[in-house]
C-alpha cells in the first residue's frame, strides 16, 4: 500500500508489476541521459567564445538530430509495446472474478462457484478498528489464492469507474454495458489496497478495494465457508 512521503512506485506483488517497475527504471535512465546531454550542449553554446561561420547550415548535425531521437524512441517504444500486449494476454485462468462498480461501492461475483457474490463498502472512520486503515478498509475483502492466474471481469451499472490495485499493476476501466477483462498473478500472500481511479461522483474517494491473497488450501476453506 502507499505510505506517507512515498515518492516511488509501490512494492510489486505480481510479475506484471515487476516488469512495469523495470520499464519505469529503463525509461528514467534514458530521460536522465537526454537531460544531461541537452544541458551540456546548451551550456557549451552559452559560455564558449567561439564563432561558427556555418551555424545556419549543417547537414551532418541535422541528420544526427533527426536519426538519434528516432533511435531513442525505439528503445522506449519496443519494451512499452511488449508490456501492453502482455497485459492483454489471458493465460488459462484458474479463477474468474467479476467486479461491478456502483456509486459508490464494489460488488464481486466468483463465477466459478455457485451463489458466491457480495458487496464491498468502505468502513466509515467512526466504525474503524484501532489497527484499521482509514479510507482504505472494507467490510468484505476480495480473497484470492497465491500463485494462480486470476482473470478479472470488470463492468459498471451506472457511471464510469476504474478498478485499480497499484501493487499488482492492475487498472481496468469499469464501463456500463461493457465487460473488460485483465489477467494477473499474485506472487505473495498479503493485503493489497486500491481505489477507484475514475472520477465517478461525490463519493468517488470512498470506494476502496482490498485484496487478501492466501494459499490455495486456505482459499478452498474460505470458499467452502462462504458457500455453505
UniProtKB/Swiss-Prot annotation:
PROSITE patterns assigned to the protein according to its UniProt record, in alphabetical order: COX2, COX2_CUA, COX2_TM
Major place of residence: mitochondrion
Keyword Mitochondrion tagged: yes
Positions with a binding annotation for Mg(2+): 198
Transmembrane helix among keywords: yes
Residues in the Mitochondrial intermembrane compartment per record: 1-26, 82-228
Classification via Gene3D superfamilies: 1.10.287.90, Cupredoxins - blue copper proteins
Keywords from the UniProt entry: Copper, Electron transport, Magnesium, Membrane, Metal-binding, Mitochondrion, Mitochondrion inner membrane, Respiratory chain, Translocase, Transmembrane, Transmembrane helix, Transport
Membrane topology label: Multi-pass membrane protein
Amino-acid positions noted as binding Cu cation A2 in the UniProt annotation, renumbered to this chain: 196, 198, 200, 204
Biological-process GO terms, alphabetical: ATP synthesis coupled electron transport
Residues annotated for Cu cation A1 binding in this entry: 161, 196, 200, 207
Cofactor: Cu cation
Subcellular location field: Mitochondrion inner membrane
InterPro entries on file: CcO_II, CcO_II-like_C, CcO_II_C, Copper_CuA, Cupredoxin, Cyt_c_oxidase_su2, Cyt_c_oxidase_su2_TM_dom, Cyt_c_oxidase_su2_TM_sf
Pfam families named among the record's database cross-references: COX2 (PF00116), COX2_TM (PF02790)
Entry GO MF terms: copper ion binding; cytochrome-c oxidase activity
Catalytic function, reaction form: 4 Fe(II)-[cytochrome c] + O2 + 8 H(+)(in) = 4 Fe(III)-[cytochrome c] + 2 H2O + 4 H(+)(out)
Similarity annotation: Belongs to the cytochrome c oxidase subunit 2 family.
PANTHER family registered for this protein in UniProt: CYTOCHROME C OXIDASE SUBUNIT 2, CYTOCHROME C OXIDASE, SUBUNIT II
Function as written in the Swiss-Prot or TrEMBL entry: Component of the cytochrome c oxidase, the last enzyme in the mitochondrial electron transport chain which drives oxidative phosphorylation. The respiratory chain contains 3 multisubunit complexes succinate dehydrogenase (complex II, CII), ubiquinol-cytochrome c oxidoreductase (cytochrome b-c1 complex, complex III, CIII) and cytochrome c oxidase (complex IV, CIV), that cooperate to transfer electrons derived from NADH and succinate to molecular oxygen, creating an electrochemical gradient over the inner membrane that drives transmembrane transport and the ATP synthase.
Protein name, as recorded: Cytochrome c oxidase subunit 2
Annotated organism of origin: Anopheles quadrimaculatus
Higher taxonomy: Eukaryota, Metazoa, Ecdysozoa, Arthropoda, Hexapoda
